[in-house]
Every structure is written in C-alpha cells, then in structure tokens.
Amino acid sequence: MHGFMTLFKKEILRFWKVAFQTVMAPVLTALLYQLIFSHVLSQHVEAYPGVSYTAFLIPGLAMMSMAQNAFANSSSSLIQSKITGNIVFLLLPPLTALEFFAAYLLAAVVRGVVVGAGVLAVTSWFGLLLPAHPLWVLVFAVFGCGVLGTLGIVAGIWADKFDQLAAFQNFLIMPLTFLSGVFYSINSLPPLWKTVSHLNPVFYMIDGFRYGFFGQGDVSPWLSLAVVAGSFALLAGWSLHLIASGYKLRQ
C-alpha cells in the first residue's frame, strides 16, 4: 500500500505541477467549442425536448475533455518513463501489478475529473446546469475516466515512441470521442450511422453522463452503465495482464 500511495502521489504531482498545460488548456479548448457551436447552432438545433442546444453541449464537452485527459495522463506518463529510462525505478521496488495499475489509473481519473469540473465551471455562465440525477453524473464521470485511463495504460505500454502514441490518439481516441454524440443526438443520424454509433463505447459514457443532467438520453442509462462497466472490466484485465507479464516494460 505504501508503494501504491507513493506512485499515486508522484503521478498527481506530475500533472499538477504543469496544471496550466494539463488542466487549463483543455478547459479553454472546451470553452472555445462551447462558444463557437452554441453561437452557430443554438437557434437551429434542439437535441432534446425542452433542452437548449447550448445546455445540451455542456455535459458532452465535459465528458469528452475528461476522457481525453484521462487517456493522456496515463499514456504520456508511461511512454515518457520508458523513453527516458526512468521506468526502471518503478520496476525495481516490490510493487504488485495491481498497485502499479491502480496508481496510474486513479491519477488519470483525478486529472479527468478535475478537467471536467473546470469545464462545467467555465461553461456554467451559458446556463447553470443542476443535475437531475447527481449519482449518475458521478458514476459516469468516474467510469468514463476509468475506461480511458486504462486504455491509456495499455497504449503507454504498447507504444515505443511518441509517434506511435500520437497515432493511437489520432486514429482511435479522436474518432471515438468526436463521433460519440458530443455535438449531436444520435437520433438525428441516418439509420446506418446510428447503428455505428451504438458500437462506440464512448457514446455510452457521454449519453449516460448527459442523462444525469437532463434525465433523458438516447438510450437507457442502465444499458450505458453495462457497456461502460463491461469495457472497463475488459480493459482492466488486459492492462493487468500486460503489467504482470512485463510486456515492453521488462523486455
């Protein structure tokens, strides 16, 4: 437990010491999205009955920012440690695979939640959102960050250089987040693309998180929870296997 806490604190300090880059920058990016899309589309789109498009955007942008930053936190830390050789100082102490995994995962969740809170704070002047179901908001915030944080661990272990990690982000994370209903309700899509959206686990994170605010979504929150929790379990098992085997860490 002492080893876990030490590594966890180290990961928290790693992103907090450069909070202007790791927290404020993504919050500013989300604010710009909010300004542009709400200005252009707020008078033309009503995603949910009785919910303005401006309000509709806020939870989606918050969850998108949380997911992207949870992934970035764990993946960038691991790849940086591997490239600089500092990973050896994490492998020498008697850390179990579970402690190693939990420290990186929880730090990623913390960064994601902090960024999400910042996005909600700066966009609140567009229309203060009071969650209809706060527990759903909390559950999907934690699980959403958990899924992408775990995927970040897998990517950080797999990648040998920053170019490979960038490809992972550009060709997997970016499409999954942008095509997940952040800027639209999938009920507005043609049948084919609606079906494709249902295959995207990030869609369920965003829809469940949005349900917590408005009490309505494109699918049942219980279905969203099942998909997100199942995705987390699969990725966590894969990540723990990679850590325990020493794949690209001890090899």
Question: Each predicted region: which residue ranges?
Answer:
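Transmembrane helix-boundary elements of multi-pass transport/secretion proteins
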Residues: 14-81, 128-134, 167, 188, ...
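Alpha-helical transmembrane segments and their short interhelical loops
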Residues: 97-169, 216-240
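Transmembrane helix segments
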Residues: 41, 156-199, 203
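Transmembrane alpha-helical segments of integral membrane proteins
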Residues: 202-214
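Hydrophobic alpha-helical transmembrane segments of multi-pass membrane transport proteins
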Residues: 28-37, 53-123, 152, 171, ...
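A short amphipathic helical element positioned immediately N-terminal to and/or at the very start
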Residues: 1-16, 209
